[in-house]
Amino acid sequence: MKKAGILNRHLAGALAELGHGDGVLVCDAGMPVPDGPRVVDLAFRAGVPSFAEVVDGLLAELVVEGATAATEVREANAECAALLDGLFPALALVPHERLKELSAGARLIVRTGEARPYANVLLRCGVFF
């Protein structure tokens, strides 16, 4: 049995399959999930696990070269906006509708139990060398 890192076997396996340039959408419980990308649904109850917890866990295991979020997060969810700004100084912002369109091209979608609006970020995988 694994003793550290991401223990969810579906998520750990999906992360191992990612490559440079692949997209990973980390989303709240209300984000529409498009057909196509692989989905690992971690939502258990409203707020569990939180968006911040999941992003933190993913960043411990992934190299991220870019991140995109919805412009609306700035006004609708200041706490999430501050988190994203702190983690991703070069955060790109697009309208929420555009983020939903971009999510269709993600390789992986990780759905959290987050119950606050616009807690979504599309990560672009980098390389460790």
UniProtKB/Swiss-Prot annotation:
Substrate binds at residues 28, 96, 118-120. The active site is at residue 20. Pathway: Carbohydrate metabolism; D-ribose degradation; D-ribose 5-phosphate from beta-D-ribopyranose: step 1/2. This is D-ribose pyranase. It comes from Streptomyces coelicolor (strain ATCC BAA-471 / A3(2) / M145). It is found in: Cytoplasm. Keywords: Carbohydrate metabolism, Cytoplasm, Isomerase. Belongs to the RbsD / FucU family. RbsD subfamily. GO terms for cellular component: cytosol. InterPro entries: D-ribose_pyranase (IPR023064), RbsD-like_sf (IPR023750), RbsD_FucU (IPR007721). Its EC number is 5.4.99.62. GO terms for biological process: D-ribose catabolic process. It is an enzyme of class 5 (isomerase). Homodecamer. One of its GO terms (molecular function) is D-ribose pyranase activity. NCBIfam families: PRK11797.1 (NF008761). It catalyses: beta-D-ribopyranose = beta-D-ribofuranose. Catalyzes the interconversion of beta-pyran and beta-furan forms of D-ribose.
